[in-house]
Each structure stands twice: as C-alpha cells, then as structure tokens.
Amino acid sequence: MSRVVVVGSGIAGLVTALLASRRHEVVLVTKGAIAESSTRWAQGGIAAVTSADDSVALHVEDTLTAGAGLCSRSAVEVLCSEGPAAVAALLAWGVGFDRDGGDLARGLEAAHSRSRILHAGGDATGSAIEEALVRAVRAAPVTVLERTAVVDLVRPGPAVVGVDVLRDGSVERIDADAVVLATGGAGRLFSHTTNPEVATGDGLAAALRAGAEAADLEFYQFHPTALALPGGFLVSEAVRGEGAVLRDAAGERFMTGVHPDAELAPRDVVARAIAERMLRQGGLPVHLDARHLDPAVLAKRFPSISAACRANGLSLAEDLVPVTPAAHYWMGGVATDLDGRTSLPGLFAVGEVACTGVHGANRLASNSLLEGVVFARRTAEALDVTAPTAAPAAAARPVTPLALDRSALQAAMWAGAGVSRDVSGLESARTVLRGDEAPLSLRTLEDANLVECGRALIEAALARSESRGAHHRTDHPLTEATAYRVAGRRKVAVPC
C-alpha cells in the first residue's frame, strides 16, 4: 500500500479519494472546510446520455462543436462514453437526482442537441453531489485535513514526492508516493466571478512552480449570466433552457440577431454578446426575462436562484433580472493524459485544474461535473500503474508570498484579460501582476498564486493571435484555419 495525497475537496478530489482509499492510504487536504468548493455551487447539472433518444455520438459531437476545433477527440470520447457509468456511481453514492415519475428528469441547456442534463434539488445539483460524496468520504478510510493549504509540491529530483502545507500557521511536510491535484480554478483572478472565495488557483500555481507543463491557459470561460448584484450569484443556463430570454436596457430581445440558437448559443457567444450590449448601453446590465414562464415551474426547478433573487428584492417570475458575464471555469490547466498523469512523475491532476483537452476552447454546459467523476475514476485506477519515464523538467521554484491590492489585480484582469482582449489590455494587466514580498500567511500565499496564474494566462493569451472559443482578441478577430494548442510558450498542432 502506498500513500496518496489528494488536494481539493470538490467532485474530482472526493471521487479520487474515495476510490483510491480502497487500495492506498489516502490523505485528503483541503484549504477550507471539506464541503467548501466550486462543486457545491454548481446549479445546472451533469450532462450524460441516459435516454433512448440520445446517444454517445450526439454528446461527442455537441462537445466537439462547442470546443471550437480544439478538443481532443479521444478525451471527448472517454468523457461521453463513460458518462453513464459515472452517473451510476453517483447514484450508488447516494446522490438523489430529480425524477419525472419513475425516470430521471432531464433538462436542456445551451448547445446540447438533446435533453440530457440531470439535476438534483432543482438547481442545487452541485450541493447535492457534494453532500453525498462528503458523507461517503467521511465513512471511508480517508484522513481529512481541513483548513490546510498547499504551499508547494516537494520535488527534490525528477518526481514529486510530497507536499508542503500551511496548517495552523505552520508549514508541515506530507510525504507521498503520489500527489493528485484537484484544486479547481482561479475565478478570483477577476472582479466578476461565480467562484467561491477559495478559487485562487493554488494547485495550478504550485504545479507551475514545480515545473509541470500546462496547456490552454488562455481559455477562461465567462458564464453569460450571473446576477449583476453583490455576490455574483450564478443564474444557470437551465433557466434559458426553460425558455427565459435576454433583453437589453431598451427591453429588446437581442440574441435572435446574434446566433441561430439565440439564448441557447454556446457560452462564449452569449457572454460576448452580453458584454458588447452592456458596452453599448454605458455599462448597464442586460436582463433575464422569465416572466412568461409558469411561476410554479420556476419555483420548483430553480429554488436557489429564486431565493437569491428574493434576497435582492426581485422575483424571478415577475421581474426583469439584471445579469452580467462572470468568470466561471478555466478550460486550461495542468496538462495531463487521459489518466490524470502530468509531465512530472508522481504528480496527477484531475477536474478543473487539469487540462486533458476535453473542453477545447469552450466548455459545453454541464460537462464539468461529468469530467470530475469520469477522470477521477480513471486517475484512481492509474495510481496503481508505474509512471512512465518523463523528460527532465526545469528546477522547482519555491513560492514567494506576496502582499498586494487584490481588488486592483482583479479589476485589471477583468479589463485586460476578460471577455474580450487585445495586446494593449493584456500588457497593461501584466504590469499590475506584482506585489511586495511578505511573511507567509494564507492571504499572501493566495495572492502569490493569483499572480502566478494571471501571468501564465496572459502569456498564453498573447501567444494566441486569433479569436477562438472563449478567447476573443479584438485585435485578431478571425479564427485561423489551422488549430493549435498553446503549451507553455509553444504552439502545438491539434490532430484532426
């Protein structure tokens, strides 16, 4: 039996820990409380083929289309073909998906050709999944270290052999035969985000400092509809799937003139259209209009969104709800194979922090929870396989804790590296990504990680002199005929 350290307690980390604990000693490290993760806030659901009128081939094609020519087909085929088994595993762990009679209830979301989105508690899918998996982990032979932040990966030679963590104000070392990063994204890079406070890119930053290869970092998905109110509460795609429409400040529906699928166009299209409309109307938000829909259906299907609206003096069923794009999901991350292996022996990555190429330039709605389960299952199996010899990596760098004005950093990233970008804005944002060396604390560690991630994102965005998917360059608005991926500063052709 070997020791495996899993970092992160969202869907990918919890599933990896559960399955790995059957054969290994597992230590689960999480920066906050175990239930505190982006998974908990996921509303729309999990996409998988579970009906006779759907097929894996259709799910594959929908995913490839959304990915704008940059998806790894092999990764997409794994995701979609293993999706039904992933759903079955969640059911076995006690996730209570909503039912329509005796059958699973299935919703429709943007860019899906079939109704295949499973949800739980209406719009509380992520919370239901997180609660079930936390219960299962608590009952499994897993050592859980809450409020414990990863400082650096330990790599004295070619391989990663442990983690240094910040716990109760002190740095401790945890030795490991394998480290699995499942730390999610870095939405806190931006002033508008749907991500929780813990999403500061800790795993990716540690991997970059350790010399791991990353890919697709220019592709950050901005969800089209977060409440344009304090807190940035996500308003799920599923509301538009039920028939809600978007209106500008003049009350005009505008998406019909943008894309044949109107409000159900791919996320990058809708987010960009909203951002452009907001610019035209002096920064005022656009509005989501669900007033023509059945109030009882809205209340049952979207209890969390309805409650968030009420908390702000609004009614989802009776009012125009102000919305804005917000940073939501990072398609890029630590480059891995289909079994979670990174370029460093002993280091694995899974979920949002990883990049298998499954999402390409733009993630299909509700594929992220599925990704977390499918690739966690594969990663847990791969822990038993001897890692192949890897090419020597650059020497690892220790973190330099930083004190900085986080709000200024977030505003600069939103303005220069947000929904739309150009070389001037990207270079301007880069000048803000600095801070003063400071004593190690959770805050200065997070700030250093945000700077590390922000610099990597900007370098990748500057390297891609085209517009594709979620990466929109106003100074390079066209999409090149040949698809390529940016890995570090290298451009790598995407096989057809």
Outline where the language-model segments fall.
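Glycine- and aromatic-enriched mobile tails/lids
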Residues: 1-3, 19, 25, 33-34, ...
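Glycine-/small-residue-rich beta->alpha transition segments that form the dinucleotide
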Residues: 176-178, 182-187, 353
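Conserved redox-cofactor binding core of oxidoreductases
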Residues: 93-171, 182, 223-227
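An anion/pyrophosphate-binding glycine-rich loop and adjacent beta-alpha core
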Residues: 34, 206, 212-321, 373, ...
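Short beta-strand to alpha-helix junction loop
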Residues: 71-84, 117-135, 145, 193-201, ...
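N-terminal Rossmann-like FAD-binding beta1-loop-alpha1 element of flavoenzymes
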Residues: 4-28
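Conserved N-terminal glycine-rich FAD pyrophosphate-binding loop of Rossmann-like flavoproteins
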Residues: 32-64, 68, 224, 236
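Core beta-strand elements of the Rossmann-like FAD/NAD(P) dinucleotide-binding domain
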Residues: 2, 169-178, 343-346
